[in-house]
């Protein structure tokens, strides 16, 4: 593994590459959040025959903080991704997005129309805030009454204190990561979540959307993306199975896999199944 920094207009961007000497089309991994960070666990294993690149978006993980929180916008993250691809000299690349990283990947294809992106892998895909909100409301309605009450009162009063946070964690244990306990690296990643980025772009939790992405919706635009697409979700994923199926049907050239007994972070809950699915898609690419 080699790591370094890329100088961009917004600041220094951290990156790492595994399998740099391999010959197949490189993977570039786009992490979720916004404000989360790259987690190589499980994903770096794809470096058997191809380079796998990770980078932390500005304001996240090991990259610089933006000097002004107004920097955090879809447009700037798309431009940043464009800079990263050019600086890493990835003439051909397969984009691999996780959650928000899927929205970023598709926004990049729609806005920049790059010639070098040969395929995209969308894991636990977030592509539409209205559809995301619909799925979360359906999940919340099935939670215990005390959890529903804490969430509803928190959202109504704008009080995201202890009761709301406790309810949020119960929801996360069911729909974000169902491992018990959570791996140390996942706990550490959540502790390093940049709340300024997350609140600015998203909101106080996965199901309360109040930031700049509140009206984000790529669903009507998906037919314009013509490269091969793989969509992956867990059977209890925040990205609901029916919604992901709708995404698949919207893309001209897409396939979909549902991982059993898995939620949003299905790549660490069911790593063997996840790797079989992705490796099959990557054959001859």
Predicted regions and their residues:
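Conserved loop-alpha-helix segment in the C-terminal half of the alpha/beta-hydrolase fold
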Residues: 212-262
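Conserved hydrolase catalytic core segment
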Residues: 91-135
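N-terminal cap/lid segment of alpha/beta-hydrolase-fold proteins
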Residues: 1-12
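Alpha/beta-hydrolase
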Residues: 152-227
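Flexible "cap/lid" loop of the alpha/beta hydrolase fold
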Residues: 118-162
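Conserved HGGG/HGGXW glycine-rich cap/lid loop of the alpha/beta-hydrolase fold
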Residues: 10-66, 70
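Catalytic active-site module of serine/aspartate enzymes centered on a nucleophile-bearing elbow/loop
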Residues: 253-285
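Active-site loop/oxyanion-hole signature of alpha/beta-hydrolase fold enzymes
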Residues: 53-100, 276
